[in-house]
Amino acid sequence: MLLTVDVGNTNTVLGLFDKERLVQSWRVKTDPRDTADELWLLYRSLIDGFELTGLAVCSTVPAVLRELRTMISHYLSDIPTTIIEPGVKTGVPLLVDNPKEIGADRIVNTLAAHSLYGKNGPCIVVDFGTSTNLDVVSPKGEFLGGALAAGIEISVDALAQRAAQLRKVELVVPRSVIGDRKSTSELQSHVRI
């Protein structure tokens, strides 16, 4: 089975695939202080009972990627591994001024979007994470660029800190996209939009 690891600034998402079928997935907090051994203890507990045939990793957190490399070399050295990072050939042309600045997550998203949806025309990929990424993919599967903005949680936190009459609210999906004239539900509507 193929274990995929997507290390984001806030969460790490792991998926276990049998060919193209997702068998299991997990979402865990990303902690850049974790050591290779701590990562292995966590990953081993999740994949226990599954036979790994491959590993694919992308990370936007250099400290975690460094520890993942160590973990892989110590505990999974016999498993074929692909780490998406600048310089790795993915088949995605990066038509931007500095391709090395494009995060691995955005490259993988481009590849997936084109494979799944892009054969008939261009597409826009929206990734709601610590930052909200909007990326444009050409009909040929080329990464054309995009826009980055603060993610939902950061936006809500910033509003609570910078707007005198707004407070931090729990990020839950409200009943309606239109808030019910209370600032709490109006801020939560941000999640729905």
Model-based region annotation:
Residues 2-6, 56, 123-127:
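Short glycine-aspartate micro-motif
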Residues 2-51, 142-167:
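Short glycine-rich, Thr/Ser-proximal phosphate-binding strand/loop in the N-terminal lobe
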Residues 11, 59-65:
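Glycine-rich phosphate-binding loops at beta-strand->alpha-helix junctions
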Residues 51-61, 80-83:
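Short glycine-rich phosphate-binding loop at a beta-alpha junction
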Residues 67-75:
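Short, aromatic/basic amphipathic alpha-helical patches
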Residues 78-82, 88-162:
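Phosphate-binding/catalytic loop of phosphoryl-transfer enzymes
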Residues 161-185:
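A mobile "lid/hinge" subdomain adjacent to the ATP/sugar-phosphate binding pocket shared
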Residues 186-193:
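Single conserved hydrophobic/aromatic residue that forms the stacking wall/gate
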